[in-house]
Amino acid sequence: MADEEDELLETELSYDQKKEIAKWFFLNAPAGEINYVAKDLKAVLSDEEVYNEAAMEAFPVYNKTHMICLEMPSGAGDVIVSSYSEINENEYLDPRTAQVAIVDHVKQICTKVRPANDEELPSLYIEEYRYALDAEIQRYVSESYPKGMSAVNCVKGKDNEGPGSDFELVVIITAMRLSPQNFCNGSWRSVWNIDFQDESQVLDIKGKLQVGAHYFEEGNVELDAKKDFQDSTIFQSADDCAIAIANIIRHHETEYLASLEVAYSKLPDNTFKDLRRKLPVTRTLFPWQNTLQFSLTREVEKELGLGK
């Protein structure tokens, strides 16, 4: 048995194994913490080549998954890095300003911008709907997510010149509050796909919400809550569609946040008590009656400025 253990200890991981393990750590870093993970990985690996290759492969995926916001040079605004705005590996469209941001994924900065060309922008007909929806979503986000950013992209049918064809818009809402000095970080991400169906005159709306929080003061507690939604409304004018869609998004997101608050308010009397020992190994009883003070959802709401 000892010989087997010695053999395992002496087994050297291959280059690819090291890279895949490093990528796993990169991709599973909580919101806003990938650079802390990168610093530790670099020290642990002691192999610049493995580290660089893992980082080059993992950072773009992480940035798009977390929909990070980067400031564009010269005060041109901010761009959300996402798969919906991706033109190529390092270029991302900001439809609001009709600019393309060139991104350094590993450094997480926007190095420069260029004007978007006609092929990268939607037609005037599609832009009318995109612009109206973008304005309504901006208004909603400014009211509900003081730390939030939003974008509306056309992902299907962007070249349609008028009624008669289907097209699809995607609403992206992302909010992040980083407070590492207080040992806590939080994020909110929501993606809403709106399929404009011309023949049936119906808008099919599908949403995905994800809330994350990480607390690491004298411990490690992480929240990762997800929820899918489906709804619909009628195909109307651009302005009327925008108002209807924004109201649907507002309704579902507000209800979801309320449901999280209710679910976590029940933790002291249900889930926590079912998990606990009769008497912990510390021989000290945990104050179950006061566990609401550790409410994750309340802290996420506070950190992101939700509900204000």
Curated annotation (Swiss-Prot):
GO CC terms of this entry: F-actin capping protein complex
InterPro entries membership: CapZ_alpha (IPR002189), CapZ_alpha/beta (IPR037282), CapZ_alpha/beta_2 (IPR042276), CapZ_alpha_1 (IPR042489), F-actin_cap_asu_CS (IPR017865)
SUPFAM superfamilies in alphabetical order: Subunits of heterodimeric actin filament capping protein Capz
Stretches of the chain forming a coiled coil according to its record: none
Quaternary structure and partners: Component of the F-actin capping complex, composed of a heterodimer of an alpha and a beta subunit.
Swiss-Prot/TrEMBL keywords: Actin capping, Actin-binding
Cited function: F-actin-capping proteins bind in a Ca(2+)-independent manner to the fast growing ends of actin filaments (barbed end) thereby blocking the exchange of subunits at these ends. Unlike other capping proteins (such as gelsolin and severin), these proteins do not sever actin filaments.
Gene3D superfamilies named among the record's database cross-references: F-actin capping protein, alpha subunit, F-actin capping protein, beta subunit
Protein name: F-actin-capping protein subunit alpha
GO biological process, one term: barbed-end actin filament capping
Pfam families: F-actin_cap_A
Family of this protein: Belongs to the F-actin-capping protein alpha subunit family.
Transmembrane segments: none
GO molecular function: actin binding
